[in-house]
Curated annotation (Swiss-Prot):
The gene is ycf4. Seems to be required for the assembly of the photosystem I complex. The chain crosses the membrane at residues 22-42, 57-77. It is a multi-pass membrane protein. One of its GO terms (biological process) is photosynthesis. It comes from Lepidium virginicum (Virginia pepperweed). The keyword Transmembrane helix applies. This is Photosystem I assembly protein Ycf4.
Length: 184
């Protein structure tokens, strides 16, 4: 999603609050909870939940392994829910031609670097770079090449843009910033 005027372009970044992250966190939570309950049932020797008969699973080694997988899955699920709650990775890219400044803001994990704020002069932008790797694990990334800073990614690698959409976005941004496009 973006907003544009004659001299300002704001590109809003989604971050971790995407439908796929909600689905994975929910599925992982339910699956790991099931594993932990089956492991606990095998330890106690009685059914904690009626779906899985505990007599079929002995505690050593199957019950221990299932309990371990359940606990590990709950930790990973907790991590996913925290990234969703904190909306890690969301933010905006602001390009202001009137002031000649580019501002990039992202939310990070809580702590010292919770707010990631980068500011550059437009005259320091060398180019807009497109990196396209086709194949099984296709990767399409849009970078902004800054003099003395290197390349800064503007579009996340997990966003499923087609090559045409990336090229269109790069062309529009390069035209707005009045810089060349490089393709790798």
């Amino acid at each position: 999603m973006s907003w544009r005027s004659e001299s300002i372009w704001i590109e809003f970044i989604t971050g971790s609050r995407k439908t796929s992250n909600f689905c994975w966190a929910f599925i992982l939570f339910l699956g790991s909870l099931g594993f932990l309950l089956v492991g606990t049932s095998s330890y106690l020797g009685r059914n904690v939940i009626s779906l899985f008969p505990s007599q079929q699973i002995i505690f050593f080694p199957q019950g221990i392994v299932m309990s371990f997988y359940g606990i590990a899955g709950l930790f990973i699920s907790c991590y996913l829910w925290c990234t969703i709650l904190w909306n890690v990775g969301s933010g905006y890219d602001l390009f202001d031609r009137k002031e000649g400044i580019v501002r990039i803001f992202r939310w990070g994990f809580p702590g010292k670097s919770r707010r990631i704020f980068l500011r550059f002069l437009m005259k320091d932008i060398q180019s807009i770079r497109i990196e396209v790797k086709e194949g099984v694990s296709a990767r399409r990334v849009l970078y902004m090449e800054i003099r003395g800073q290197g390349a800064i990614p503007l579009i996340r690698t997990d966003e499923n843009f087609t090559t045409r959409e990336i090229e269109q976005k790069a062309a529009e941004l390069a035209y707005f910033l009045r810089v060349p496009i490089e393709v790798f």
